[in-house]
């Protein structure tokens, strides 16, 4: 699973995800993409599950790009432990995703296959998403 090799600080504040994504909102690599429509933290496990769903559905043809990286450590205290005594240990890593952010990109596969692969991936993610195409019109993809 994805996680940083090295970080400046071991633990992070929870924070809030405000506003729309400034960067990473256009397709830069592939012809088709999966775009987030709402703010949410996406865990490394969810990204990996979505990646597996896509690669299995397209039967390893074409090329897949993951456009988000889980760089936020999420800490958790163990079960049945009293409050206080410091912050809990890091439980998992997550990516803060803002609306408009491209999560995955695909190239080298037909449009309808890309759309169905992204729909399967969307089921693994905690955000509402939509399929976008480099050349605008997504009516030929079906589903949307």
Swiss-Prot record:
Q: Which GO terms describe its biological process?
A: translation
Q: Which PROSITE patterns match?
A: RIBOSOMAL_L16_1
Keywords attached to this entry:
Ribonucleoprotein, Ribosomal protein, RNA-binding, rRNA-binding, tRNA-binding
Q: What's a Pfam family in this record? A: Ribosomal_L16
Q: Name one GO molecular function term.
A: tRNA binding
One GO CC term, this protein: cytosolic large ribosomal subunit
Superkingdom of origin: Bacteria
Task: Fetch the HAMAP family from UniProt.
Answer: Ribosomal_uL16 (MF_01342)
How does this chain assemble?
Answer: Part of the 50S ribosomal subunit.
Reported function = Binds 23S rRNA and is also seen to make contacts with the A and possibly P site tRNAs.
Q: Which family does it belong to?
A: Belongs to the universal ribosomal protein uL16 family.
Query: What PANTHER family is this protein classified in?
Result: 50S/60S RIBOSOMAL PROTEIN L16, LARGE RIBOSOMAL SUBUNIT PROTEIN UL16M
Q: What's the name of the protein?
A: Large ribosomal subunit protein uL16
Originating species: Erythrobacter litoralis (strain HTCC2594)
The encoding gene: rplP
